[in-house]
């Protein structure tokens, strides 16, 4: 079903920029890297990235709890305190850069990765495994991109890059 929907949208002129995002009229905004922006989100469930700080307002994935989360957010009086966040280590910043860029249709810029982290992304063990499954490919313009099949599995692929420390934080998060 997913692949059929992707094909239908692409046949109708949509550009796939991530697993779930398709844009009909691509602009220069679609070309922006997913790894550099300072992203400040507002609202219930908003997720922000400010340098090495990552934080989010409370959110839920439980349908019956969503209204309560929104009500709690609406009752907040002090928005200057980040209650759900952490400072990312250098390794976490590396993993976040990989996840955010690899999941984005432009892919990961190998030169930028080396500039930031001092080594080639070709040394990333998981990249070799993903290439063997034909889920990623190197492009002529120096990027590592998901293949069409890789994009279909991007929820799974993204999980592979989550470190044990972050996984523990995710598992202990209270919805």
Language-model features, listed with the residues they occupy:
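Short, amphipathic alpha-helical interaction segments positioned at domain boundaries
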Residues: 151-175
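Extended hydrophobic-aromatic, low-complexity segments
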Residues: 110-111, 122-123, 138-139
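A short, conserved structural fragment
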Residues: 131-141
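Ser/Thr-centered flexible coil motifs
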Residues: 87-89, 147, 163
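Non-catalytic, well-ordered alpha-helical scaffold segments
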Residues: 92-100, 124, 151, 155
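Accessory beta->alpha helical hairpin/"wing" motif in late/C-terminal subdomains of nucleic-acid enzymes
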Residues: 139-157
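C-terminal scaffold of the Radical SAM
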Residues: 1-117, 174
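Short amphipathic alpha-helical interaction segments
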Residues: 117-132
């Amino acid at each position: 079903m997913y692949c059929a929907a992707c094909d239908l949208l692409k046949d109708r002129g949509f550009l796939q920029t991530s697993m779930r995002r398709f844009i009909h009229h691509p602009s220069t905004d679609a070309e922006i890297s997913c790894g550099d922006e300072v992203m400040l989100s507002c609202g219930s469930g908003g997720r922000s990235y400010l340098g090495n700080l990552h934080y989010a307002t409370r959110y839920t994935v439980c349908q019956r709890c969503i209204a309560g989360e929104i009500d709690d957010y609406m009752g907040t009086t002090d928005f200057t305190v980040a209650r759900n966040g952490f400072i990312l280590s250098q390794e976490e910043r590396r993993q976040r850069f990989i996840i955010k860029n690899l999941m984005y249709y432009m892919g990961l810029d190998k030169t930028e990765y080396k500039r930031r982290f001092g080594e080639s992304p070709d040394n990333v063990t998981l990249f070799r495994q993903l290439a063997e499954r034909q889920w990623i490919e190197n492009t002529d313009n120096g990027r590592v991109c998901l293949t069409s099949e890789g994009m279909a599995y991007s929820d799974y692929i993204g999980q592979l890059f989550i470190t044990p420390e972050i996984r523990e934080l995710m598992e202990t998060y209270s919805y």
